[in-house]
């Protein structure tokens, strides 16, 4: 068994987006648009935003990037988010933001049908209730796409999944999404006892703890699907995930996502998919 070809999955997703774009009558409709609001000067955010803009432009989605000063006041940030929401089909607040701002309030100002990140309380509730209009956070959707691709049948009934992450970006929405598709999901976190007992028995293991090469062969067994959402740097400054891929593959026959070139590239592709979903909700 080997590393999962996430580039092939990404291309399938982007081709679907292209197909949806071709259905639009541009004589009467504008092209789908995405607004990205960045607050402050976070280096990682610059890279992520650049990748999103590049991908969107390559497939025909219009992007407006709004850069705000890191010392902006809460009320002014709220005003800008409300104003920008009116002018676009989809809008996102690039995280993280400066600590003096109330992230929850800012995110929940975004209308549900334009919440391309799927992070508003309303969207999260709709996802839990399996509402067809729910917008799924892009990383969680990317993980779901990988599982579907690897299972081939697309049927998650009876599949045991352990997710080691309980964030709103990955763990919580992924638990809801997979449960809605009849998988059996165990959500683990930093307070979980005997983590190895959960990971070893599962068909699928999803990690997202932000610890370089934390998971070695102790946590896995043969014939598992391992999806690594971690993005870290090892002691040599090299990009790596949460899983020690080489060590695990020496011990067990597993399928595992690479880092880099794994879940990260699918997150951007799935964001484009969500832009189309937002557009369709409004047209």
What are these regions (language model features)?
Residues 31-41:
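Short beta-strand segments enriched in small/hydrophobic residues
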Residues 56-70, 185-188:
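Short beta-strand elements in bilobed, periplasmic/extracellular small-molecule ligand-binding domains
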Residues 76-87:
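Short, well-structured alpha-helical segments in soluble
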């Amino acid at each position: 068994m080997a590393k999962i070809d996430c580039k092939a999955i990404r291309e399938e997703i982007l081709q679907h987006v292209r197909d949806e774009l071709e259905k639009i009558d541009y004589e009467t409709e504008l092209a789908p648009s995405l607004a990205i609001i960045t607050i402050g000067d976070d280096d990682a955010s610059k890279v992520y935003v650049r990748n999103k803009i590049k991908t969107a432009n390559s497939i025909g989605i219009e992007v407006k990037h709004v850069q705000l000063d890191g010392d902006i006041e809460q009320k002014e940030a709220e005003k800008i988010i409300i104003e920008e929401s009116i002018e676009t089909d989809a809008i996102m607040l690039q995280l993280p933001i400066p600590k003096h701002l109330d992230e929850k309030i800012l995110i929940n100002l975004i209308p549900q049908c334009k919440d391309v990140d799927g992070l508003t309380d309303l969207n999260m509730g709709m996802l839990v209730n399996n509402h067809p209009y729910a917008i799924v956070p892009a990383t969680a959707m990317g993980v779901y796409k990988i599982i579907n691709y690897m299972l081939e049948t697309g049927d998650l009934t009876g599949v045991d999944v352990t997710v080691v992450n309980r964030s709103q970006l990955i763990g919580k929405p992924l638990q809801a999404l997979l449960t809605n598709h009849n998988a059996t999901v165990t959500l683990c976190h930093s307070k979980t006892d005997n983590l190895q007992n959960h990971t070893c028995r599962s068909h699928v293991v999803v990690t997202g703890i932000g610890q370089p090469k934390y998971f070695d062969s102790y946590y896995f067994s043969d014939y598992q699907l391992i999806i690594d959402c971690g993005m870290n740097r090892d002691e040599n400054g090299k990009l790596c995930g949460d899983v020690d891929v080489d060590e695990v593959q020496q011990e067990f026959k597993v399928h595992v996502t690479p880092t880099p070139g794994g879940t990260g590239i699918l997150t951007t592709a799935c964001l484009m998919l969500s832009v189309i979903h937002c557009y369709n909700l409004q047209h």
